[in-house]
């Protein structure tokens, strides 16, 4: 246990001895240490960093980054320099944050004491080693004394006592103290040793023992590499002492750490952010003089700049975030501290919080107790925290009590930075803080003295994230750090006080009033939103984690109050006050490697900005953030973030800007009065968190809780921290009510902060509030922390502005759910994606996550399993990522509006928990998400296992293969995960003919990244089923069409795994999904759309988002799994056995995204899969939405027009609108196209409408009908109208008949692949762009489906996705091919008749799949789930790399039996024998073609590639039953007209509706035909003219006579069509009109349709002659009207006869004729007759 005599810094464990692995402080090298600090301060960067930290932490050393609102994460991917060193250097400068003032008592005293710049290396901050040493010595002595020493030290730190003078013992006492706390923390941080001191240390602390050099007494269980005394809140108060210790420690740190860091940087390529000093690589250097803290972007995801001074400890946080602490924030106080630091480097409040929480907690942890005397308590608490997150609450309470005392004693404005070392031990995150120990020493042994570091001034400088290689960095955005910096310190300390566990309830009460006030004031000052968040991890993970940390949660809320939402978590954004990095399982789950978006959460969530930010925080400080673009794979994602921010502005109005993690800024001052209660409440909040969390589901409860909070007049912990600024009695809480619900609960405790019962009530209320709070204005992350989370949530819920509106609790709850909604879903997904991390975190907190608000958080996280962690930087196409992000962020934005109230509520559950996590130090959240995800080894392992079956991002983030595109819901292609390590792959398995096997590819979404072919698929499906439990998948997903079709989707959802793994939170998880669903509903506007899956992360990985607004699968996992397993195991196994003929396609992730999905399905997919439009093809948002987002709604009709909006738009709404519009148009207009396109809806709606109208009006109508019977003309008119109306109804009915089951767009996801089986291994049709196989769907055995295997190679897949995008932007139409699901899969060569079977077949086995998986991962590390396109591309690439070919596979409902080219070729003899019949059939086919093309026009789509081989023929019978090729005759007969389908939109042009003003200016000199793109406008018309020749067995006139196009030909130059039938002349006229060389004179496709209708059923030659001889227009009209009346009557008679003919039935021609006659008018007839006559 004793340290060796000589301290040799360990290369890989800075701060630890390479011989004894003990912290340097334990080596009795006080003289050197003391000297070193000063030296470092002056000379070394690390020293400076340390000094800065010391300066900041003047009483509570806090990482400089924590001081300033800083980018919590440094992009792991640095563009040019992969070295972290450069990044660190930049960070050093960044470290120059405003000194964070420690408000030991949370009074301004402390805060104001050390407003010095951290940069004033020992001097400004009392940086001098002597003061610190004194503090350390005192601490050491006091530590030796156990409580007394610690208490004294704390007092000294607080400035309450003259203990600092005890410098005589400086070396010994200081060293002892350092060894005990500072050392432990320092070392733990430096060494990257698990910050057992912090939180997990509670458990892990047992393993480590920090002993004072002169004593055998174990002062701490935490030996942190960077466990600097300055980091402990106790020491913080005594800046000098701490700084002495720090410097002393830092000396070693500077030398060893610097070297170690350098080595790490060089050797690992991903340096841990140790506390790099200004000259040493220190990531955070704080200089008061500098305006910005510059944080270098790192190449490694671990290398992130934490708001907290970034030490290796932070890196360790990344690696070993204690799950317990993280989740439970049991290190709540510690985490608070850390969070504060992380949240806003400049937020003293955060430090304070951290000091209190972290220091007291860490003290407890490190010391095994608050003081050496309480090691058991600490450990117990730590354990409890880890188990329940409640113990953390206790610790926090202790911390709070300490803080209360300290605060009361010392209102120093120290910039001491509390360097908390978060370490993951046993899957738990431990926060190590040295300060806490000293504080603990000062306070009673049983009590942790929490010293709150409250930055009095908004000195904290905004953080700039800059790549050390600046050329690589580009200014990205402005982040407002002012709020975070100002209010950071306020909320936390108070929370600490109130959350002080019963251990120090008395202290807590004493502390709360004044301290809280001071803190609150400060909190109000500090409003910082994390500059950037991992779109995926932060949002997704924070809420979950926060809620999970129910026990520690209460502490977190205070921190949350101060800190903005965690940078990494959009949810955090909503935190009203400072961002406190929250150790949320989600965040920790997300592993950030250097491969993960530059080690940053997928993107920096940029506080969007000035307007919103200004609104959110009155004292907003705009911090230009320079982000290394290279750090992010997709800037598009950033764009989406920015765009989201725009939306966020709305959210920000509530101040809980949901747009970003950082956005949550709440006025700390308002929370002032509730802070004490918050402190008191927090511990119980944790306890209640569990109970309340379960309750949380009911809105009533939320309201009650909220009301209770309001009644109590106390803000939730979040608010509490805000209230801290003002007196605890402040009623500002009401303003913060949303956040105040929890606050209120805790607030009531504030008055009796020491009264646990009150706290319990507060906790219960908070929990209830959390459960029921509609996300105030902040994402409901607080619930996860329970009281703390609750308060945090409320804080987040109520942004700074919201603080003033405290009185409006419900509005704040409405806090933009969008942020959290997407974030929640994203977070939830991230959690599930990083299932193991989440599960661990949640589990570590014990069942607490499940039982408590933390559980809520977990639950919500689970319910909305965060989308897979942000996919590796090369996630998915920027477009896809941006879409996801936009979705997430738009969702975040939406929550701002009261409209999201319900949504907010739901979000509150999921997001609220997230918020709780965010509310906890939001920054910590970021860290958590970064660190934790990265750090939790257990989680990582689990995640890895899970990831084995999932795509793994470059950063190690598991890109859960959520059904990549919601569209890929069909299981016949199974994406299975044979092993956890296997990637999902879609295996096409088919039986030769029905026997050989069905093409069954079970696409288990996320589970089977590496699954091997069939076995893997089968295994994967099973695994996925097992891994993704139904509980994980919300029922909502099931409700979605997609999820309905394939409940399996959710199984693939990473979130599902998370929920599943977190067995404890399974039950809670389901409710959160509901809540989340509600959120999503609000976001998506379609409740069904809210899919439980947070697909945002899956493909986007960053949208986390966000992006993502994908939600966690709502379907019960079981259902989904079952669906996946449905045909998967049996069929796949069978197929494997029967594979011989058609080897199963290597399982590959199939992009369902590109395939049309019913909107409901699509949304479900979006939510669950977060599927985005194929990234490869950045098409219209419609495309993305429809392919990625419209997975839910089958009705792309309505949706398609706005398919791009489908992601956010309720599918139901969309569909009805188009149908209404279409039906109206078709009724009102003659356009058959409208009737066709909306025929189904038109039928149902019109039929319902007109039919009902007729019924309702029938009696009056009958009366009217019988009037005027004496007037013949009147009677004739009535008969005419009756026939017309009847025909219209019949036409609509026919549409319903022929479009039966096809009006709703299907979106089959990967989960549905297992349910598909190829019925034959022989293609039913080979078209120009693909080959079609018939398939059966197990869930719809009566319907036939076709599997379309695109011929395009992987490189050309983008073209296909473009085609999909275009198609999905269109509503369903009878003559336009529908994609029911699209995937990228490895297809056996035998299924590719056009390819050489040798090469592809080799890759048909499962090994290829695994290879594919690996390749997919390699493919840029983009998580396939992120963007369907990307995954497909990946898969394509993989396939290409492998011997198998990767092809886009699409499921369609229309089973083509031949192409028009085949039909024309086979009908040559028929044309000669029966020209009339054949040419009539040609007219019918051309009419359908024109109808389909006309359908494209309103959507500005031009096919541009009309060829006979791209037109498919489907044998169609009324009722929508498509006949297979076998029953169909190669040559369709007139008796059974064939349905024509337009396919292959790869060359389609779609004009964007969005006009860029710049483009408009540029177009001022362009010709109209160019501007209007007229060159494409009538391209289809021209190509249709060519098709007329080709269908009549004539050559293309321009092929035969190329000079025609070269010269200005005229219609007369075109070849003549032989007059073989009555239709020949009309076709000639039509062809000449369509081939008019002048586009302006070329007839429209609608006119061409009218001509064809006229040729088929219109007036004949005899009528034309009479028509021409008619003298007047009236005569002509009368003539046409009479003809029309007769034709309508005849058709009515025909329908009547066919209705009696049981065998006959209505034919396709009858329907087409009915459309014509029902909507024809004399004017339209006259117009067509004129065209035919005069052209």
Swiss-Prot record:
Probable catalytically inactive kinase. Scaffolding protein that regulates the cytoskeleton to control cell spreading and migration by modulating focal adhesion dynamics. Acts as a scaffold for mediating EGFR signaling. The modification Phosphothreonine is found at residue 1141. Homodimer. Interacts with BCAR1 and CRK. Interacts with PRAG1. Interacts (when phosphorylated at Tyr-1177) with SHC1 (via PID domain). Found in a complex with PPP1CA, PPP1CC and SHC1. Interacts (when phosphorylated at Tyr-632) with tensin TNS3 (when phosphorylated on the SH2 domain); TNS3 also interacts with integrins ITGB1, ITGB3 and ITGB5 and mediates their association with PEAK1. InterPro entries: Kinase-like_dom_sf (IPR011009), MitoQC_Scaffold_Kinases (IPR051511), Prot_kinase_dom (IPR000719), Tyr_kinase_AS (IPR008266). Belongs to the protein kinase superfamily. Residues 1274-1300, 1659-1732 are annotated as: Required for homodimerization. Residues 864-873 have a biased composition (Pro residues). Residues 325-336, 367-378, 498-509, 847-863 have a biased composition (Low complexity). Residues 902-919, 1037-1055 have a biased composition (Basic and acidic residues). Phosphorylated on tyrosine in a CSK-dependent manner in response to adhesion to fibronectin and to EGF stimulation. Phosphorylation at Tyr-662 by a Src family kinase controls subcellular localization to focal adhesion and focal adhesion dynamics. Phosphorylation at Tyr-1177 is essential for binding to SHC1. Phosphorylation at Tyr-632 promotes interaction with tensin TNS3. This is Inactive tyrosine-protein kinase PEAK1. The modification Phosphoserine is found at residues 282, 537, 569, 584, 645, 824-825, 897, 1363. It is found in: Cytoplasm, Cytoskeleton; Cell junction, Focal adhesion. Pfam families: Pkinase (PF00069). The dimerization region encompasses helices both from the N- and C-terminal of the protein kinase domain. The gene is Peak1. Residues 111-121, 130-145, 337-365, 384-393, 566-580, 704-735, 745-757, 819-839, 879-901 have a biased composition (Polar residues). It comes from Mus musculus. Residues 1302-1664 form the Protein kinase domain. Residues 1076-1086 have a biased composition (Acidic residues). The keyword Phosphoprotein applies. GO terms for biological process: cell migration; focal adhesion assembly; regulation of focal adhesion assembly; substrate adhesion-dependent cell spreading. PROSITE patterns: PROTEIN_KINASE_DOM, PROTEIN_KINASE_TYR. Gene3D superfamilies: Transferase(Phosphotransferase) domain 1.
């Amino acid at each position: 246990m004793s340290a060796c005599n000589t301290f040799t810094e360990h290369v890989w464990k800075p701060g630890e001895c390479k011989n004894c692995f003990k912290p340097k402080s334990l080596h009795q090298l006080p003289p050197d240490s003391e000297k070193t600090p000063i030296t470092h301060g002056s000379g070394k960067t690390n020293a400076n960093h340390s000094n800065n930290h010391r300066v900041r932490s003047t009483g509570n050393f806090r990482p400089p980054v924590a001081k300033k609102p800083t980018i919590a994460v440094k992009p792991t991917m640095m563009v040019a320099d992969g070295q972290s060193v450069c990044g660190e250097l930049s960070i050093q400068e960044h470290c120059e944050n405003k000194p964070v003032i420690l408000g030991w008592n949370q009074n301004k005293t402390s805060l104001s004491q050390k407003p010095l710049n951290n940069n004033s290396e020992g001097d400004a901050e009392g940086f001098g080693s002597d003061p610190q040493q004194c503090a350390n010595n005192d601490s050491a002595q006091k530590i030796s004394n156990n409580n007394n020493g610690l208490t004294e030290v704390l007092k000294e730190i607080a400035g309450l006592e003259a203990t600092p003078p005890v410098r005589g013992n400086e070396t010994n006492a200081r060293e002892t103290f350092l060894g005990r706390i500072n050392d432990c923390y320092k070392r733990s941080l430096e060494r990257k040793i698990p910050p057992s001191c912090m939180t997990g240390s509670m458990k892990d602390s047992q393993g480590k023992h920090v002993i004072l050099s002169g004593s055998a007494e174990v002062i701490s269980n935490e030996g942190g590499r960077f466990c600097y005394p300055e980091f402990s809140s106790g020491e913080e108060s005594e800046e000098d002492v701490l700084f002495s210790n720090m410097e002393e420690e830092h000396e070693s740190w500077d030398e060893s750490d610097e070297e170690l860091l350098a080595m790490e940087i060089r050797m690992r390529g991903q340096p841990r952010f140790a506390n790099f000093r200004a000259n040493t690589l220190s990531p955070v250097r704080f200089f008061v003089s500098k305006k910005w803290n510059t944080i270098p972007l790192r190449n490694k995801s671990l290398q992130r700049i934490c708001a907290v001074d970034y030490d290796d400890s932070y890196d360790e946080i990344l690696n070993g975030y204690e799950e317990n602490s993280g989740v439970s924030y049991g290190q709540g106080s510690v985490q608070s501290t850390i969070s504060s630091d992380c949240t806003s480097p400049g937020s003293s409040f955060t430090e304070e919080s951290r000091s209190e929480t972290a220091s007291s907690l860490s003290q407890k942890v490190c010391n095994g107790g608050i003081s050496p005397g309480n090691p058991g308590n600490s450990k117990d608490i730590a354990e409890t925290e880890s188990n329940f997150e409640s113990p953390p609450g206790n610790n926090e309470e202790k911390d709070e009590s300490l803080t209360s005392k300290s605060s009361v004693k010392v209102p120093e404005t120290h910039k001491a930075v509390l360097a908390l070392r978060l370490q993951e031990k046993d899957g738990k995150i431990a926060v190590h803080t040295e300060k806490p120990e000293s504080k603990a020493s000062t306070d009673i042994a049983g009590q942790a003295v929490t010293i709150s570091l409250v930055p009095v001034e908004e000195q904290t400088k905004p953080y700039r994230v800059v790549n050390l290689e600046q050329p690589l960095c580009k200014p990205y955005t402005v982040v407002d750090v002012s709020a975070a910096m100002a209010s950071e310190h306020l909320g936390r300390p108070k929370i600490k006080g109130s959350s002080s566990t019963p251990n120090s309830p008395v202290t807590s009460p004493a502390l709360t009033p004044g301290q809280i006030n001071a803190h609150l004031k400060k909190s109000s000052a500090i409003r910082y939103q994390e500059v950037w968040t991992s779109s995926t991890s932060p949002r997704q993970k924070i809420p979950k984690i926060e809620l999970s940390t129910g026990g520690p949660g209460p502490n977190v809320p205070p921190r949350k109050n101060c800190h903005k939402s965690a940078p990494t978590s959009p949810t955090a954004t909503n935190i009203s006050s400072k961002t406190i990095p929250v150790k949320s399982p989600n965040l920790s789950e997300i592993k950030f490697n250097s491969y993960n978006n530059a080690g940053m959460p997928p993107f920096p969530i940029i506080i969007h900005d000035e307007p919103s930010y200004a609104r959110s925080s009155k004292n907003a400080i705009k911090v230009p953030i320079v982000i290394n673009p290279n750090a992010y794979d997709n800037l598009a994602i950033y764009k989406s973030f920015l765009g989201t921010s725009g939306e966020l502005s709305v959210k920000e109005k509530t101040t809980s800007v949901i747009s970003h993690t950082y956005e949550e800024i709440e006025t700390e001052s308002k929370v002032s009065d509730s802070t004490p209660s918050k402190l008191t409440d927090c511990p119980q909040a944790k306890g209640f968190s569990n109970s309340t969390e379960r309750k949380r589901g009911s809105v009533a409860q939320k309201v009650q809780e909220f009301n209770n909070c309001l009644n109590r007049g106390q803000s939730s912990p979040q608010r509490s921290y805000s209230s801290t600024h003002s007196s605890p009695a402040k009623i500002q809480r009401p303003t913060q009510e949303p956040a105040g619900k929890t606050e209120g609960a805790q607030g009531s405790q504030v008055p009796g902060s020491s009264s646990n019962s009150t706290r319990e009530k507060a906790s219960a209320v908070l929990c209830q509030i959390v459960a029921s709070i509609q996300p105030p204005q902040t994402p409901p992350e607080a619930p996860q922390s329970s009281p703390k989370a609750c308060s945090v949530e409320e804080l987040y819920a109520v942004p700074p502005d919201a603080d003033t509106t405290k009185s409006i609790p419900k509005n704040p709850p409405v806090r933009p759910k969008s942020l959290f909604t997407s974030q929640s879903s994203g977070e939830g997904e991230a959690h599930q994606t990083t299932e193991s991390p989440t599960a661990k975190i949640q589990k570590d907190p014990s069942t607490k996550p499940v039982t408590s608000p933390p559980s809520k958080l977990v639950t919500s996280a689970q319910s909305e399993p965060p989308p897979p962690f942000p996919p590796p930087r090369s996630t998915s196409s920027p477009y896809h990522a941006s879409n996801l992000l936009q979705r997430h962020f738009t969702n975040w934005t939406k929550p701002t509006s009261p409209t999201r109230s319900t949504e907010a509520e739901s979000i509150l559950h999921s997001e609220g928990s997230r918020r709780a996590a965010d509310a906890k130090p939001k920054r910590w959240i970021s860290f958590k998400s970064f660190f934790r995800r990265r750090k939790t080894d257990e989680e990582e392992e689990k995640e890895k296992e899970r990831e084995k079956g999932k795509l793994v991002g470059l950063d190690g983030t598991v890109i859960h293969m959520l059904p990549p595109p919601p569209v890929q819901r069909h299981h016949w292609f199974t994406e299975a995960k044979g092993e956890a390590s296997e990637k999902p792959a879609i295996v096409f398995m088919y039986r030769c003919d029905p026997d050989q096997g069905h093409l069954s590819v079970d696409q288990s979404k996320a589970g089977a990244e590496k699954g091997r072919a069939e076995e893997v698929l089968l295994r994967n499906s099973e695994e996925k089923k097992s891994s993704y439990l139904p509980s994980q998948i919300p029922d909502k997903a099931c409700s979605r069409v997609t999820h309905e079709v394939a409940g399996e989707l959710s199984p693939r959802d990473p979130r599902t795994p998370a929920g599943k793994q977190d067995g404890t939170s399974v039950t809670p998880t389901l409710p959160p999904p509901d809540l989340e669903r509600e959120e999503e509903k609000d976001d998506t506007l379609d409740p069904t759309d809210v899919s439980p899956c947070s697909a945002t992360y899956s493909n986007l990985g960053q949208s986390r988002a966000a992006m993502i607004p994908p939600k966690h699968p709502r379907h019960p996992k079981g259902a989904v799994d079952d669906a996946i397993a449905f045909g998967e195991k049996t069929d796949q196994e069978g197929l494997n056995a029967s594979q011989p003929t058609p080897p199963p396609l290597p399982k590959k992730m199939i992009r369902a995204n590109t395939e049309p999905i019913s909107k409901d399905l699509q949304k479900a997919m979006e939510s669950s899969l977060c599927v985005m439009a194929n990234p490869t093809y950045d098409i219209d948002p419609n495309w993305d939405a429809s392919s990625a987002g419209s997975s839910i709604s089958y009705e792309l009709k309505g949706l398609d027009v706005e398919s791009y909006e489908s992601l956010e738009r309720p599918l139901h709404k969309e569909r009805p609108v188009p149908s209404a519009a279409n039906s109206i148009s078709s009724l009102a207009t003659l356009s058959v196209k409208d009737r066709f396109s909306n025929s189904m809806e038109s039928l149902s709606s019109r039929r319902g409408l007109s039919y009902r109208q007729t019924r309702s009006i029938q009696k009056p109508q009958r009366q009217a009908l019988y009037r005027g019977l004496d007037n013949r003309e009147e009677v004739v008119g009535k008969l005419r109208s009756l026939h017309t109306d009847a025909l219209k109804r019949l036409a609509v009915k026919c549409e319903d008949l022929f479009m039966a089951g096809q009006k709703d767009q299907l979106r089959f996801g990967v989960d549905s692949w297992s349910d598909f089986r190829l019925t034959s291994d022989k293609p039913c049709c080979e078209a120009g762009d693909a080959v079609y196989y018939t398939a059966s769907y197990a869930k719809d055995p009566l319907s036939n489906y076709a599997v379309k295997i695109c011929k395009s190679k992987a490189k050309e897949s983008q073209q296909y996705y473009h085609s999909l995008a275009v198609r999905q932007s269109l509503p369903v139409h009878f003559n336009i091919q529908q994609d029911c699901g699209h995937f990228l899969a490895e297809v056996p060569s035998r299924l590719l008749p056009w390819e050489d079977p040798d090469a592809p077949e080799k890759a048909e086995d499962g090994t290829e799949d695994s290879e594919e998986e690996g390749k997919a991962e390699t493919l840029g590390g983009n998580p396939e789930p992120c963007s369907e396109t990307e995954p497909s591309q990946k898969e394509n690439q993989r396939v290409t790399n492998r011997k198998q070919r990767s092809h886009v596979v699409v499921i369609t409902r229309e089973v083509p039996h031949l192409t028009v080219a085949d039909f024309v070729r086979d009908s040559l003899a028929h044309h000669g024998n029966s020209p009339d019949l054949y040419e009539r059939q040609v007219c019918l086919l051309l009419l359908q073609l024109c109808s389909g093309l006309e359908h494209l026009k309103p959507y500005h789509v031009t096919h541009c590639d009309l060829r006979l081989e791209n037109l498919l023929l489907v044998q169609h019978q009324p009722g929508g039953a498509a006949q297979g090729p076998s029953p169909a005759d190669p040559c369709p007969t007139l008796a059974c007209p064939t349905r024509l389908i337009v396919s292959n939109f790869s060359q389609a042009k779609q004009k964007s509706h969005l006009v860029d003003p710049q483009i408009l200016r540029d177009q001022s000199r362009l010709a109209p035909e160019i501007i209007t793109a007229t060159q494409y406008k009538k391209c289809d018309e021209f190509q249709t003219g060519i098709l007329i020749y080709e269908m009549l067995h004539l050559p293309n006139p321009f092929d035969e006579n190329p000079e025609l196009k070269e010269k200005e030909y005229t219609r007369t130059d075109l070849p003549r069509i032989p007059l073989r039938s009555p239709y020949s002349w009309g076709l000639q006229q039509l062809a000449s009109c369509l081939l008019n060389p002048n586009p302006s004179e070329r007839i429209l496709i609608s006119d061409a349709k009218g001509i064809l209708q006229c040729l088929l059923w219109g007036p004949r030659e005899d009528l034309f002659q009479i028509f021409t001889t008619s003298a007047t227009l009236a005569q002509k009209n009368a003539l046409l009207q009479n003809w029309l009346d007769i034709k309508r009557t005849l058709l009515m008679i025909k329908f009547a006869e066919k209705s009696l003919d049981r065998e006959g039935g209505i034919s396709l021609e009858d329907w087409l004729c009915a459309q014509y006659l029902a909507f024809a008018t004399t004017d339209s007839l006259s117009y067509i007759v004129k065209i035919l006559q005069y052209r």
